[in-house]
């Protein structure tokens, strides 16, 4: 009977060693140590033996049971480790391989034009100044020679947050804040978002504006014309033709609207330019002495010019876009063209 136990042990150990999966190992465990397993049946048959035989064979059978249980646990550990290694090997990444290519994003067309404008002025010595989008009535209007009862306030609608707090309607307040902090000479542009309650094919409640300011001794309207001529030719091409029309802005005197020959019809007249052959592009003028006085500059000693342009307006003309609202609809087919 001892030989039978030894043979059972050898056979069980061989099957344990041959098991490659957790399922195979579980089947071997049930075959030998389960309720109806071979070793379990042997232990149950000990009741037919004498007391001395029970002690001898029972002790040996329990030793084999302990040994086999240990073998099963060891095999279970090995199989689990091999399984984990196999999973890790299957999921391993070769970090030396090139990554998956992905489509590159691109800057929004308005951002592209804004960055181009800022780059042009930065190259000729202008600094970029920024300010708050929520402004006081003073900086947005009064400091710019637009008192509360001034009819110029009717020239543009305004979002009022509170009675004396507005969403800025232009970036001109940045010029006032800069001049309050800095003595001449001043040479800045102030790009940023501005707000007016208006919405149609050529207006949106929020749009981007760039305003420029240059203050020093001896600055003339000729300097303004030369700067804007060079700037617009760099934006639209050397063949660009400009004209200056007298206009009115409360913070500049004299003031001028700047037009360029229509980039669509080349001055022949079309729907875009209203058959005039010209496109309004920006406003400009010499800084009004009253504005200088508001910031503590002596208008007898210093002069300067200012100008302002809508970035979306430039982008529309540059790319031939007829509806400003397309910029803000997040339509991929439209945006991917730029």
UniProtKB/Swiss-Prot annotation:
Reactions catalysed, as given in the entry: tRNA(Phe) + L-phenylalanine + ATP = L-phenylalanyl-tRNA(Phe) + AMP + diphosphate + H(+)
EC number of this enzyme: 6.1.1.20
The keyword Ligase is annotated on this UniProt entry: yes
Free-text comment on the cofactor: Binds 2 magnesium ions per tetramer.
Enzyme class: ligase
GO terms, biological process: phenylalanyl-tRNA aminoacylation
Subcellular location: Cytoplasm
Family in the record: Belongs to the class-II aminoacyl-tRNA synthetase family. Phe-tRNA synthetase alpha subunit type 1 subfamily.
Subunit structure: Tetramer of two alpha and two beta subunits.
Name of the protein in its database record: Phenylalanine--tRNA ligase alpha subunit
Organism: Syntrophus aciditrophicus (strain SB)
